[in-house]
């Protein structure tokens, strides 16, 4: 089942839009973010398996939705004192559990609300923001503050 879903995802990625550049890591991230937990079924005589059933069962529809948005987030340029907004719903299938880390936090002020990330330049320099979906997908945003 998983190998067939992978083949379908690769075909879908390269399909009608003729995109290029799908890497093994991108496919792995999409797969790991496309599962449903099976812990809720571990009740009664199966309670001993609670927490021991791996990451869960693969949701192929969710995989195709994830693979459609697996491409990276474009680099951003922002002036000192200026603000740019990035609608992360264009890059992630679910935006309710997004988190981020910043390589140089004192260069940019970040506000994440409702799937929109606002970046305000604080001082000149370059930093990388890694946005995560709470599962396996991690996308970098290269930010230059001018």
Annotate each language-model stretch with its function.
Residues 68-146:
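Extracytoplasmic soluble-region selector
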Residues 3-7, 62, 125:
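Short, solvent-exposed alpha-helical surface patches in non-cytosolic proteins
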Residues 1-51:
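Hydrolase catalytic cores
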Residues 60-69:
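Secreted peptidase-domain scaffold signal
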Residues 29, 33, 62, 90:
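Charged/polar, solvent-exposed surface patches and flexible loops
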């Amino acid at each position: 089942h998983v190998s067939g879903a992978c083949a379908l995802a690769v075909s879908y990625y390269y399909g009608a839009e003729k995109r290029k550049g799908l890497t093994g890591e991108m496919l792995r991230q999409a797969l790991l973010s496309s599962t449903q937990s099976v812990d809720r079924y571990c009740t009664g005589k199966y309670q001993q398996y609670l927490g021991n059933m791996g990451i869960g069962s693969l949701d192929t529809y969710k995989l195709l939705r994830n693979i459609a948005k697996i491409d990276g987030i474009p680099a951003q340029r922002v002036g000192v004192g200026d603000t740019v907004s990035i609608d992360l719903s264009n890059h992630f299938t679910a935006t309710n559990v997004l988190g981020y880390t910043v390589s140089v936090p004192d260069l940019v002020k970040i506000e994440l609300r409702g799937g929109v990330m606002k970046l305000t330049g604080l001082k000149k320099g370059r930093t990388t923001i890694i946005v995560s979906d709470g599962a396996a997908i991690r996308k970098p945003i290269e930010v230059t503050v001018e």
